[in-house]
């Protein structure tokens, strides 16, 4: 057996697993041949090791036997990869001493320019929705024997209040100003489903054992799927267990703004001490660091310091770390040292459960049929789902009418009309044809080759799920086919989604494109 057999095994596993499964469990494995002829697969942590051992080891051995020869029993060993921080730090320059940072003129500083600094305009443009609009800083920080503490005397020239800044706007549910956490984001009100099951389990483990094997925890997925909720739930749980824990949550833009402010005031040493003294650092939307070289340099050393100190980090992003353009490879590599998990758009059952929970929290009686109707129509993300529910509740409150499926349809009629306008059979055919790199005329033709028939079946299934057209109408729209052909296509795609990872991923991607 050789590493070539493992490479063949990787190719097969990538075709069998969904993208998120492969990226989470298989891609992080590092293979090497041991002197005794064993193939050793090293996992980045115990969590991945246990999962691969329990779920995938049998399949891996089957494939190795297939590629190495049926008569050769695969000699396979699974282990946890040892993290040698000394070696890791040799890969790149070590962090400079805290006292060696020179003063930098922000007008000539690349980071200041990247962050939007302009003379006379403050750190960043305070546009509506900007994470830096209406910022307040708490009392300036000084060093004490137990870390940073707030002082009440006025700021001195050149002194920077390096706590995470907070908004003047109060978030519903209350904010813990010490950690900048929204206390309404908890594990108790997070709805678990197939789409977020792994991320939820990993977050619970981190909350119970911060700084352990799953450090950093990297959560990625689209907008409005619950990444921030889950990350803040960990922070809230950590502070519930230890009220004195120094947990800091912030958006990545805030980290950049704090650093630029520190450079302006010649207080970069205080900045370093603060961010390296926390017990847990939670940073949202890490993709904002892309293209900001000075920020990445500083965060790289902060990352190393926290990891070596056993301090927990949780990062969120809108994409897999390897796919972040403009981010240094050394950071991408380190993001994978812990556990990387995906959150997918919620499936129908989870969407219904979310609506029922939100209605209950609002003291509103929502029937299953009404929740099902909303969940069937709003598929893109949790944020839009909640927005639709709030609209229905408000309409019910103002009119005094009970919430029924008909009332829901009436309340959301303009939203549904817009959705129907955007998602119609013509658009579905166009998007599917572009996705599979075929012509729309191929979908309407009598051709039955798999390269055309399968995309046609996918398009028919999407048309049934995303539009209100009947089976005869769908069949007719695809080259004058009858309703039995459309029904067969829908059933076939549903069956393939359970057995074919490629079809399952294609369908998810197309659904995301059509509903976002």
Swiss-Prot record:
Alphabetical GO biological process terms: DNA replication initiation; regulation of DNA replication
Cytoplasm found in the keyword field: yes
Entries under InterPro entries matching the protein: AAA+_ATPase, Chromosome_initiator_DnaA, Chromosome_initiator_DnaA-like, DnaA_C, DnaA_dom, DnaA_N_dom, DnaA_N_sf, P-loop_NTPase
Region listing for Domain II, in residue ranges: 72-179
Gene source species: Marinomonas sp. (strain MWYL1)
Region (Domain III, AAA+ region): 180-396
Cellular component GO terms, alphabetical: cytoplasm; plasma membrane
Similarity comment: family membership: Belongs to the DnaA family.
Keywords: ATP-binding, Cytoplasm, DNA replication, DNA-binding, Lipid-binding, Nucleotide-binding
Domain comment, as recorded: Domain I is involved in oligomerization and binding regulators, domain II is flexibile and of varying length in different bacteria, domain III forms the AAA+ region, while domain IV binds dsDNA.
Protein name per its UniProtKB record: Chromosomal replication initiator protein DnaA
Lineage summary: Bacteria, Pseudomonadati, Pseudomonadota, Gammaproteobacteria, Oceanospirillales
Binding residues for ATP: 224, 226-228
SMART domains per UniProt: AAA, Bac_DnaA_C
One MF term in the entry's GO annotations: lipid binding
Region (Domain IV, binds dsDNA): 397-516
Region (Domain I, interacts with DnaA modulators): 1-72
Its job: Plays an essential role in the initiation and regulation of chromosomal replication. ATP-DnaA binds to the origin of replication (oriC) to initiate formation of the DNA replication initiation complex once per cell cycle. Binds the DnaA box (a 9 base pair repeat at the origin) and separates the double-stranded (ds)DNA. Forms a right-handed helical filament on oriC DNA; dsDNA binds to the exterior of the filament while single-stranded (ss)DNA is stabiized in the filament's interior.
Subunit-structure text: Oligomerizes as a right-handed, spiral filament on DNA at oriC.
Entries under HAMAP family matching the protein: DnaA_bact
Pfam families: Bac_DnaA, Bac_DnaA_C, DnaA_N
Localization, UniProt: Cytoplasm
